[in-house]
Regions:
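A polyanion-binding, active-site-adjacent surface
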Residues: 1-167
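Generic C-terminal helix-cap and adjacent flexible tail
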Residues: 166-175
Length: 175
């Protein structure tokens, strides 16, 4: 870890929504707050949440596949370190008995939470979810680097985001 260990997560046993991402970015590592960057700003818009709601651990759990910033590679941040999730993920998720909705961001989180669909493209997973919504929602990473994907898939904003906001509101209202 180029910047040293600084595990970042947010979790309360009463959380209704789990956000399963990749790993903290450089800005989040520096601030000590998950999604404290442009990706977090975009994600909060997607979910229809204010910053205070998003960072309320009694509502939202944020548990990335890698808890620490992994460093930067040729095309952005490196993937989460491979030893992290196998060591702690399952016991940590067991502490979230009230999770009603899991939002899965990025390829590594998708492989963990939707292992039977690891070979499917994100577009295929999202179209399947639109056809038959489940409590596990695959999402693109909200990074500004994914702008090209968003432009190639305008149906994401038109169809997925309204339903996503509805599901988020329902999960939080059940509290």
């Amino acid at each position: 870890m180029p910047l040293g260990p600084r595990p970042l997560l947010q979790a309360g046993t009463g959380a209704r929504i789990l956000i399963a991402g990749q790993a903290p970015g450089r800005r989040a590592h520096a601030s000590g707050i998950p999604f404290d960057d442009a990706s977090g700003d975009r994600l909060r818009v997607w979910l229809g949440l204010e910053r205070a709601q998003f960072y309320d651990a009694s509502l939202i759990a944020i548990i990335p596949m890698g808890l620490c910033y992994p460093g930067t590679g040729a095309h952005g941040d490196l993937p989460p370190r491979p030893e992290c999730a196998p060591a702690w993920r399952a016991p940590l998720l067991e502490q979230l008995p009230h999770t009603e909705l899991t939002l899965v961001l990025g390829r590594h989180a998708l492989a963990w939470h939707l292992p039977r669909h690891a070979r499917a493209t994100l577009s295929e997973l999202l179209l399947a979810w639109l056809a038959q919504p489940t409590p596990v929602i695959p999402l693109p990473h909200p990074s500004p680097r994914n702008q090209a994907w968003m432009k190639r898939h305008p149906w994401f904003g038109e169809q997925v985001l309204p339903l996503l906001r509805q599901r988020v509101a329902q999960a939080l209202a059940s509290r």
